[in-house]
Every structure is written in C-alpha cells, then in structure tokens.
Amino acid sequence: MSSEFVISMAEKAVYVTLMISGPLLAIALLVGLIVSIFQATTQIQEQTLAFIPKIVAVLLALIFFGPWMLSTILSFTTELFSNLNRFAG
C-alpha cells in the first residue's frame, strides 16, 4: 500500500463527507440567515425563533436528500470494501 493510495483514499473520504454534509449545512445556513434578517427587521429577540426553523428545515432536507446521501455513502463503502485486499496486502 503506497502513500499515494492512502492519500487518494483519504481524499475520497473527505470529498464524500463534504458532499453528504454540504446540502444540509447550506440549508441550515440559508434558513439561519433568513431568520436573522427577520429578527433584525422586526426586533424580535426570541432565542427559540432561531433554532426551530433550522431544525425543521434540516429535517425536511434530510428527508429530501436522504436517499441520495445514502446511495453516495453506500457506493463509497462498497468501493472501499471491494478494494479491501489492496489495503491488507
């Protein structure tokens, strides 16, 4: 197992992690920004107003993006396990 192979697998793992977490983080960021703008314009300083819409939006995004996320992680895991003999040898 060469160092290039290890770096390649680590690079793929980081890429898959970013691809899976990216949509949920982007939606949470967007909803948080919208709620913050709403709070600033209406001068409402309720703490729960910031968290509940983000939780609901991320939950809905998880339902929407869940199958794609699962297929992405399964294909990476399948590739990882199919090349297991290259790791040990």
Swiss-Prot record:
It comes from the Bacteria. Keywords: Bacterial flagellum, Cell membrane, Membrane, Transmembrane, Transmembrane helix. Its main location: membrane. The keyword Signal does not apply. GO terms for biological process: bacterial-type flagellum assembly; bacterial-type flagellum-dependent swarming motility; protein secretion. The chain crosses the membrane at residues 18-38, 55-75. It holds the Pfam family Bac_export_3. NCBIfam families: fliQ (TIGR01402). Role in flagellar biosynthesis. Belongs to the FliQ/MopD/SpaQ family. This is Flagellar biosynthetic protein FliQ. It comes from Bacillus subtilis (strain 168).
